């Protein structure tokens, strides 16, 4: 039982320690990445403090200590130490690291949605599934019966501006459809289609 616990603890702690170091080494990683969205997402500068990797290091130390306790047949002490460490590590990681990862993965899209908050416009995501537009855009209630039809928003006779958040790896597909690029930030772009007055 003690060796699998040690291996698992060291594996998890290595991952937890390595992830915060992305900001330091992203310029070396980018040449090996083939996905345009991932590359563009890494252009975001998340504000790392520099000590987040210590959470993983702490878990590694605790894993080795617990392994030593298991080897000495002090199972309850080893298990208690592991449980307490996870009670510290998980909330610490959630508070200090996860928000910074969110900066790369979805913050630009959420900021786009928030910038449209309260405006009388249509807001949708294109090329990816998301419910963020419903939570963050707070747009005015829709009255047109076709507002839920993405094809109508893209090509139909819309009655107000339609804004779309698209991942950059799908950008070329949609800028051909009478959509205008407003801004690109990280791995996302904000597009708009204005109503045509007949």
Task: List each language-model region with its residue ranges.
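Membrane-embedded architecture of ER/inner-membrane glycosylation machinery
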Residues: 1-198
């Amino acid at each position: 039982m003690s060796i699998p616990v040690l291996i698992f603890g060291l594996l998890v702690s290595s991952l937890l320690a390595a992830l915060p170091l992305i900001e330091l080494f992203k310029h070396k990683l980018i040449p090996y990445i083939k996905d345009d969205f991932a590359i563009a997402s890494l252009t975001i500068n998340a504000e790392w403090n520099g000590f987040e990797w210590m959470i993983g290091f702490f878990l590694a130390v605790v894993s080795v200590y617990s392994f030593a306790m298991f080897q000495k047949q002090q199972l309850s002490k080893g298990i208690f130490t592991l449980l307490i460490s996870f009670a510290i590590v998980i909330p610490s990681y959630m508070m200090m690291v996860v928000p910074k990862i969110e900066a790369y993965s979805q913050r630009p899209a959420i900021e786009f949605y928030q910038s449209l908050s309260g405006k009388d416009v249509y807001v949708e995501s294109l090329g990816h599934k998301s419910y963020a537009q419903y939570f963050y855009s707070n747009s005015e209630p829709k009255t047109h019966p076709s507002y839920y039809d993405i094809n109508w928003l893209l090509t139909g006779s819309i009655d107000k501006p339609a804004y779309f958040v698209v991942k950059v790896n799908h950008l070329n597909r949609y800028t051909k459809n009478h959509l205008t690029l407003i801004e690109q930030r990280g791995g996302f772009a904000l597009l708009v289609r204005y109503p045509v007055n007949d």
